[in-house]
Curated annotation (Swiss-Prot):
Residues 1-182, 250-258 are extracellular. Residues 204-228 are cytoplasmic. Its main location: membrane. Keywords: Golgi apparatus, Membrane, Transmembrane, Transmembrane helix. The lineage of its organism: Eukaryota, Metazoa, Chordata, Craniata, Vertebrata. It comes from Danio rerio. Belongs to the CD225/Dispanin family. This is Synapse differentiation-inducing gene protein 1-like.
Amino acid sequence: MESLSELQNPLLDKNSKHMVMADYGYGGDFHSNQYQENIINYFVTGGGGGGGGGGGGGGVAVTGGNGKAKSQLLDATSLHLAVEAFYKPNFILYKDDVSGKGKDYKNECCETTFMEKKDKEVVVETPSTEDPQAKLLDENDVKIQTVSYEVEEEEYVEYETDCSSDSESEDNFIVIPPRDHLGLAIFSMLCCFWPLGIAAFYFSQGTSKAVTKGDFPLASIASRRALFLAALSITIGTGVYVGVVVALIAYLSKPGHI
């Protein structure tokens, strides 16, 4: 095949009068009657030549002018071109220069794309041409804010010891019953000022009774009263004894009494 028309129509005879001109494909739109006439002439007289593009493994029967059937070889790769001959062409094939202009037109076009991203993501992705080591350094420069505080363990320990001492004193106050001061009350009653000693002995017995009943507040009050009266009885008794001794010495020191 030496021309573009043979490439486009391999089944047509080289001597056919309906060959395509020059470097163009379908030259334009044909009238319907002329187009049908071309198809009929293709099947009636087109097979008289050497059979277009040879090489296919099949054939088709074509009736010649003398009424005899003649086999014509077909090219399997060019059958679609023969099928297109049955339809009216609606397009025009241009030369290669037009395709070159189309390529230039495509090259001149610019494509714009819209990307929906956050500002932070855009800022991170824009310096793609920069050095990756500089990017890593920028990431390492990011400061992380931390909050630190110190716990003063010494004050906490002191506070804990104070609480423990208070609790221990309260426990001791509750566990240890108040003293009745019975011995001191008896001494004050017998050896000192006996009226106050008797009163101290009375409160001492009241303290022991309150402890047995479990009434510790009342027992503590009675114990304090017994201690106070016993001490007062001893003080008064001591004063009485000292006064008696002084009076006796003064009386005996006079000269008329010997």
